[in-house]
């Protein structure tokens, strides 16, 4: 429901309350679910009207929504049960036990049995835990206090506990204002209008005639724009307030936490409308979770901690979450079959799959070496032997160890969540961080002398929205560092060497679990207040903790000193073991290793085999010995999709186990050339063709992955000799015929007399918006149906050329504009509700539902040439101008806040990076400027390097990579990739060979793995985004009608969720959509590493060479 509809409900509630329609008020509260009336709820609870209490609650939550809801319903039904027992109504008590309380037996059978046993007592107060139960009135009051705390901590009640501050009779006031406005529109207004009905618009009758025609639907040209325009508001839901942290989520683990120091302040996404009063008022309630995330104890911390950790069951201990709904699965989903075996050369001690690519594996070994493997190609891409980068930064103690030639091994390798960094921990003092942007670009970043003795574990986390690395070691400490090597926290408290760490966040609480070799588990917040937990792990020795992929379930696995292994699931809310998995062998020397997969499976390496469990079943599901050769306690690691499992072998190597999907991913680079010729796409050899190297495949229809494309591998590095399955040759994909890809021409576009100069997909992926050179915007929408259930844009289903019933067009103001010289520009709001555009005249804000102009601003001169919404505030827009300035404009107050000067010619591109906190601008002067978002001061200006003989003019466009660190620069003479943090060009491609025409447009695919590039001769190139190597060429003959000379694409747009779909706008006004065929699934084949030796399209020329 839209925000205005929500506000209307509040106005109706106020009206009903003022008119004393009491039952109607509470019924609307319940049915809308917008406002939970605590006063009404209190009255019903204290009166013991339990049916009314549960009926009212049902409008806001159900028993199994979350653990807070479950606890609320449990407390109510428990009180109802106890009161029946107190009245000696045993039959009623049995009815409540069977009908109301039985649902909780699923989650805690022991507790249900204990409650049942109360029936056998003459007075339930004989039970020790209920001995202090007083009279009914007192018990209800105590319970009500607990319910209030649970309701305030429950995220489902957030923003529903305070009624917005309204003036009395606000709905009547609005109606009166509407009537006054209608009266002003009357052609013959009477001095004392007679208002007889609200069912129709008001008009004044003529003295001797019929009613004057209503003017309400006619354009009102005399009304001025409101001073405080609620920008982008009428159809936009209120953005959620900052999520408040709930203590209950980790009550047992962190009961003594301090809300003030728990985690960073919330990042408040600026509202699209002025902040509603209820969101401001609710922050003032002392019991309501605060706007800044923190730990909020809804009970006394010490009492809560003791209650949670005591071993005896309690009537208050039912907070088990409801079972998660899992997708159907079968044993075939498990990677149990050996797919390949690779030789590392020394004992493998740690492995980790790249988070963005299923077949890239990082391996650490006992010699201190790390290796990056591309599994599909069986390639050892990069190896880095252990080496001290800077001895002067190491402690004297470490230098003394090195002088004794003490061997050093890798204890842990890890990827940062975004895949931009690799962390390596060693058995002596050090950790090393590498910056990673592809196998050919693994750079030394930071070396830290982190601990005295071994660094036993390493993990990445993002406290305070800053990437950090967390380490633990033999010195009994846990430390938190930023990636530059600066230490932020040191956590002391363990009495033994710390074995492992598990950083996590839940309900905006960021924390770290740690385990020591004495079996103690501790939990830490990012503060200096000490550990929140001191608890024993099963086995009381080396234990590792892991969360399921979705972060909702916590597991630990370890071994005792006697060699007994334990795998358990924890009940976080209680600080107790929920499930202990069975069928381990006894007395194995060493520590058992485990991993989780797809929120459903657990895998453990034990007794020379891999055992698998369903998370919901304590018995082994299946096991495999991977065709033999495994050590007694193998290390193992799943890839992100769970279709590959890396397992260490006893012969200094590792095996890859796969399920059917895993085998397909491994064959992605192995398909023989003879088989590739059977695909619908015609592959032709192109001498010296530019290539890409490593495929980050995203299946059609899969969720978009925030990822990077890997560039070419280094041919000089050692490789595995077994290459019989490798492709014998690689050929550039060339699409020459319409049958070789899916394509569609959007309806009502062919033969138009105007050019498509701007093209966008809607953010939902269900529509395309085109801006013509005449200033008119057109919208196409896909609707869900049997052929297209998702309702997303696709080339296989014809969309609707969408227009509102009014027949309005989205037409920009072009009065007095020379359209030949205009630079039309467009920007879409994040929620697809509004589009802002200009075509040489004023900037217009259009409602995407009605096509009505909501407001106009920034009249020329100078004309607007580029528009970009601020990523953190839709009310702030960066507007590039014809006179080379950039205006930072606030729509809400209709004011230019800053004017940026740094270019010499008109602005042609703008892009924001929230990661770097900068705005990047480009102009027709071939200059790129970097501006601080905080101060709007210019940081640097860079000229793009022009090829020899080319003039530095023409439009330059910029777009950030999804990592927000690299930026694509597009000019008719080149594609270039800049490192925005250093403001330096790192890669460049110049039109050449079959793609020698000037570039007309280019854009990243949604996952930034590909770059779609259009050329003025009609060719389209699909490039690998990291290496700028050509993967596929689409000829004009594949998508343009024959005989249309001079027809070419002017602009390209990429689908926001499907990385393999794009659209192009042509100079005849038509819009074409393109997708690879189902059989192919992607644009072009990934070349084997040998193809890297062919001439590259990436320009390695120096700036001086370019200018010669």
Swiss-Prot record:
Positions with biased composition (Basic and acidic residues): 716-725
Pfam families per the UniProt record, alphabetical: LisH_TPL, TPR1-like_2nd, WD40, zf_topless
Residues modified as Phosphoserine: 214
PROSITE patterns reported in the protein's UniProt record: CTLH, LISH, WD_REPEATS_1, WD_REPEATS_2, WD_REPEATS_REGION
Keyword terms, alphabetized: Jasmonic acid signaling pathway, Nucleus, Phosphoprotein, Repeat, Repressor, Transcription, Transcription regulation, WD repeat
Repeat (WD) residue spans along the chain: 343-383, 405-444, 450-491, 493-534, 583-623, 628-667, 751-790, 818-856, 859-899, 902-941, 994-1033
A biological-process GO annotation: regulation of DNA-templated transcription
Main subcellular localisation: nucleus
SMART domains: CTLH (SM00668), LisH (SM00667), WD40 (SM00320)
InterPro entries, per the entry: CTLH_C (IPR006595), LisH (IPR006594), Quinoprotein_ADH-like_sf (IPR011047), Topless_fam (IPR027728), Topless_Znf (IPR048419), TPL_SMU1_LisH-like (IPR054532), TPR1-like_2nd (IPR054080), WD40/YVTN_repeat-like_dom_sf (IPR015943)
One GO cellular component, as annotated: nucleus
Places the protein is found: Nucleus
Subunit structure, as described in the record: Tetramer. Interacts with NINJA/AFPH2. Interacts with SMXL6. Interacts with SPL (via EAR motif). Interacts with SPEAR3/TIE1.
Domain notes: The N-terminal TOPLESS domain (TPD) (1-209) binds directly to a 12-amino acid LxLxL EAR motif peptide.
Protein's name according to its UniProt entry: Topless-related protein 3
Lineage of source species: Eukaryota, Viridiplantae, Streptophyta, Embryophyta, Tracheophyta
């Amino acid at each position: 429901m839209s925000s205005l509809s929500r506000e209307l409900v509040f106005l109706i509630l106020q009206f009903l309350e003022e008119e004393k329609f009491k039952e109607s008020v509470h019924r609307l509260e319940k049915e809308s679910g917008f406002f939970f009336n605590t006063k009404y709820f209190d009255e019903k609870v204290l009166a013991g009207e339990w049916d009314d209490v549960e009926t009212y609650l049902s409008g806001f939550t159900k028993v199994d929504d979350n653990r807070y809801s479950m606890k609320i319903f449990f407390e109510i039904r428990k009180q109802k049960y106890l009161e029946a027992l107190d009245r000696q109504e045993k039959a009623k008590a049995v009815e409540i036990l069977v009908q109301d309380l039985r649902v909780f037996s699923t989650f805690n059978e022991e507790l249900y049995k204990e409650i049942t046993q109360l029936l056998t007592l003459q007075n339930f107060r004989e039970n020790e835990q209920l001995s202090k139960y007083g009279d009914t009135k007192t018990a209800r009051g105590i319970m009500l206090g607990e319910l209030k705390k649970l309701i305030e901590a429950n995220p489902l009640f957030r923003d529903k506990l305070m009624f917005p501050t309204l003036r009395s009779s606000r709905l009547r006031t609005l109606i009166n204002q509407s009537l006054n406005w209608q009266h002003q529109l009357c052609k013959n207004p009477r001095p004392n209008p007679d208002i007889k009905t609200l069912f129709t618009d008001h008009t004044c009758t003529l003295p001797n005639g019929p009613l004057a025609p209503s003017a309400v639907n006619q354009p009102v040209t005399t009304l001025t724009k409101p001073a405080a325009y609620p920008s982008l508001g009428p159809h936009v839901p209120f953005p959620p307030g900052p999520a408040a942290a709930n203590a209950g989520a980790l009550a047992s683990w962190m009961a003594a936490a301090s809300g003030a120091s728990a985690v960073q302040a919330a990042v408040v996404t600026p509202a699209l409308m002025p902040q509603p009063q209820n969101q401001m008022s609710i922050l003032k309630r002392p019991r309501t979770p605060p706007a800044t995330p923190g730990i909020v104890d809804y009970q006394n911390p010490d009492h809560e901690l003791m209650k949670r950790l005591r071993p005896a069951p309690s009537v208050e201990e039912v907070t088990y979450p409801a079972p998660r709904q899992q997708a159907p699965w079968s044993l075939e989903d498990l990677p149990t079959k050996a797919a390949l075996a690779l030789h590392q050369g020394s004992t493998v001690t740690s492995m980790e799959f790249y988070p963005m690519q299923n077949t890239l594996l990082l391996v650490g070994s006992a010699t201190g070496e790390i290796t990056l493997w591309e599994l599909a190609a069986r390639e050892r891409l990069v190896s880095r032997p252990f080496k001290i980068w800077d001895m002067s930064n190491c402690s004297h103690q470490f230098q003394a160890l090195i002088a004794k030639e003490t061997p050093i091994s890798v204890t842990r390798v890890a990827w940062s969540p975004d895949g931009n960094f690799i962390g390596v921990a060693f058995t002596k003092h050090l950790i090393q961080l590498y910056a990673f942007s592809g196998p050919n670009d693994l750079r030394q970043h930071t070396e830290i002398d982190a601990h005295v003795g071994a660094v036993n574990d390493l993990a990445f986390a993002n406290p305070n929205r800053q990437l950090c690395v967390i380490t633990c070691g033999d010195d009994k400490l846990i430390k938190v560092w930023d990636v530059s090597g600066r230490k932020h926290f040191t956590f002391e408290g363990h009495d033994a060497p710390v074995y492992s760490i598990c950083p996590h966040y839940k309900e905006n609480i960021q924390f770290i679990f740690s385990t020591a070799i004495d079996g103690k588990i501790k939990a830490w917040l990012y503060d200096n207040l000490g550990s929140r937990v001191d608890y024993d792990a099963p086995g009381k020795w080396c234990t590792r903790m892991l969360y399921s992929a979705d972060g909702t379930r916590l597991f630990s696995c370890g071994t005792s000193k006697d060699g007994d292994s334990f795998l358990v699931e924890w009940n976080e809310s209680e600080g107790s073991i929920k499930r202990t998995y069975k069928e381990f062998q006894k007395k194995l020397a060493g520590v058992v290793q485990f991993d989780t997969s797809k929120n459903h499976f657990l895998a453990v390496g034990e007794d020379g085999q891999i055992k698998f469990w369903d998370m919901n079943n304590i018995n082994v599901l299946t096991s495999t010995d991977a065709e033999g050769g495994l050590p007694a306690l193998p290390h193992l690691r799943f890839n992100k999709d769970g279709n590959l499992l890396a397992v260490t072998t006893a012969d200094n190597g590792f095996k890859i186990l796969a399920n059917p999907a895993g085998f397909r991913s491994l064959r992605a680079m192995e398909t023989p050339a003879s088989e590739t010729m059977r695909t619908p796409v015609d592959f032709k050899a192109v001498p010296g063709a530019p290539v890409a190297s490593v495929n980050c495949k995203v299946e059609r229809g899969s969720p978009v992955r925030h990822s990077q494309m890997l560039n070419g591998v280094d041919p000089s590095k050692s490789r595995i000799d077994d290459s019989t399955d490798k492709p014998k040759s690689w050929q550039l994909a060339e699409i020459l015929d319409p049958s070789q890809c899916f394509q569609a021409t959007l309806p009502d576009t062919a033969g138009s007399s105007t050019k498509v100069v701007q093209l966008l997909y809607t953010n939902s992926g269900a529509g395309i918006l085109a801006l013509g050179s005449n200033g008119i915007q057109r919208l196409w929408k896909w609707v869900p149906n049997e052929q297209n259930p998702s309702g997303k844009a696709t080339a296989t289903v014809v969309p609707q050329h969408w227009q509102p019933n009014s027949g309005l067009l989205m037409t920009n103001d072009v009065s007095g504009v020379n359209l030949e010289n205009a630079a039309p520009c467009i920007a879409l709001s994040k929620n697809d509700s509004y589009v802002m555009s200009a075509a040489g005249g004023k900037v217009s804000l259009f409602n995407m539902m009605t096509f009505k102009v909501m407001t106009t601003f920034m009249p020329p001169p100078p004309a607007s040439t580029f528009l970009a919404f601020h990523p953190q505030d839709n009310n702030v827009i960066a507007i590039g101008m014809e006179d080379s300035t950039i205006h930072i404009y606030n729509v809400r107050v209709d004011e230019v806040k800053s004017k940026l000067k740094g270019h010499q010619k008109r602005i042609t591109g703008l892009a924001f990076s929230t990661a770097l906190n900068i705005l990047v601008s480009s102009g027709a002067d071939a200059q790129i400027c970097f501006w601080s978002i905080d101060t709007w001061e210019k940081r640097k200006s860079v000229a793009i390097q022009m090829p020899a003989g080319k003039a530095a003019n023409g439009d330059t466009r910029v777009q950030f990579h999804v990592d927000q660190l690299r930026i694509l620069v597009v000019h008719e003479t080149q594609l270039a990739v800049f490192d925005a943090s250093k403001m330096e060009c790192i890669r460049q491609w110049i039109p050449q060979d079959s793609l020698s025409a000037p570039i007309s447009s280019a854009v990243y695919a949604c996952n930034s793995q590909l770059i779609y590039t259009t050329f003025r001769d009609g060719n389209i190139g699909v490039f690998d985004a990291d290496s700028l190597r050509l993967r596929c060429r689409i000829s004009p003959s594949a998508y343009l009608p024959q005989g249309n000379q001079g027809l070419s694409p002017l602009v390209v747009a990429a689908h926001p969720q499907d990385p393999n779909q794009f659209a192009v706008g042509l100079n005849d006004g038509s819009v074409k959509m393109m997708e690879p065929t189902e059989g192919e699934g992607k644009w072009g084949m990934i070349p084997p590493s040998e193809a890297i030796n062919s001439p590259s399209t990436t320009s390695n020329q120096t700036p001086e060479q370019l200018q010669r």
